């Protein structure tokens, strides 16, 4: 499926974006190995998260999926209750699922194969294979990419590990393995990354120690069931935040969005660029802060993106670069080489698409330089990347003519009702097949 957009006359209204993808992954995994029943409200029913649910079900976890209410009811099997799956576990397009499951499965008393789609089979796994091997895991992989064959070892040993890059997925993988290891596992980060795993471990009553840059867990503990309500995903909200910011006449409110400080890079950077964003009704529930976000149109200026904001914005850069494309002046992003090993090479994909829409964009090995200008209509390729697809749908709100975005089926991995909500606030996005359009 493709997206076809036409320029918007302005966004308005109030919407609630779906539940946070990162928290959904972690919540169902921890609930599955907890003792007792956990109800998960606000679960993201996207393809990535449902791949995690399916994997846990194949290992014996009882998970009732109430899809139309975004609810899971999970009967935990306890720390030692998982069973060998009958076949390879298919993680679909989800790098988070395969990396979290690798940590969980490294310490089990059975062997497992983890695989995924063609995109996932190009994603780098050496970053988890090396530290898990130090803990005593044995993992076979050709070229350090999936499929991964994990030979479970119930006698893992805790390690002290310095992450070479700020990565919440790698950190979480090792913390999960640490739950099954003898002794203490401590992870030190070069910069803060999203901390949902740490917050959820606390929510499920598991003891951990944390300071500014390190997190430690000791093996042998238990997780206790605890109902959880998942806030809206700020990565999904970011598309509407940018769309309203760049489109004249816009004013929207996004309700009950997760505003975890380790995820606020996109708001921090947009405010540096001059955005009019107001965060209100701040509350904290289930260890996670939430708030309403009101956004009004504003004129933006280009900036040099501070390195400390890069890990806090890593998933939102595609749409942030759309904001940079219409800002006055130059925006420079560096220290973001991680963008090249996402679902696609996001640096190359964004530079390619922006150039096709008339924007001066230059690729760097670890980032991009964008000279703000005027978006023209045209046709771009999402390269089967959900965030690239939605980012260029946002570009279409302000472009001088229609924008066609190719290969958007993967939006279902993270935001199944994106088109519906986009049109609800006035973005004019249509899903089309063949050469149809508006």
From Swiss-Prot:
The keyword Transcription does not apply. It is an enzyme of class 2 (transferase). GO terms for molecular function: 3-phosphoshikimate 1-carboxyvinyltransferase activity. Pathway: Metabolic intermediate biosynthesis; chorismate biosynthesis; chorismate from D-erythrose 4-phosphate and phosphoenolpyruvate: step 6/7. Keywords: Amino-acid biosynthesis, Aromatic amino acid biosynthesis, Cytoplasm, Transferase. 3-phosphoshikimate binds at residues 22, 26, 167-169, 315, 342. Phosphoenolpyruvate binds at residues 21, 95-96, 123, 169, 346, 387. It catalyses: 3-phosphoshikimate + phosphoenolpyruvate = 5-O-(1-carboxyvinyl)-3-phosphoshikimate + phosphate. It is found in: Cytoplasm. Its EC number is 2.5.1.19. It comes from the Bacteria. The active site is at 315 (proton acceptor). One of its GO terms (biological process) is amino acid biosynthetic process. One of its GO terms (cellular component) is cytoplasm. Pfam families: EPSP_synthase. InterPro entries: Enolpyruvate_Tfrase_dom, Enolpyruvate_Tfrase_sf, EPSP_synthase, EPSP_synthase_CS, RNA3'P_cycl/enolpyr_Trfase_a/b. HAMAP family: EPSP_synth. Catalyzes the transfer of the enolpyruvyl moiety of phosphoenolpyruvate (PEP) to the 5-hydroxyl of shikimate-3-phosphate (S3P) to produce enolpyruvyl shikimate-3-phosphate and inorganic phosphate. Homodimer or homotetramer. NCBIfam families: aroA. This is 3-phosphoshikimate 1-carboxyvinyltransferase. It comes from Coxiella burnetii (strain RSA 493 / Nine Mile phase I). The gene is aroA.
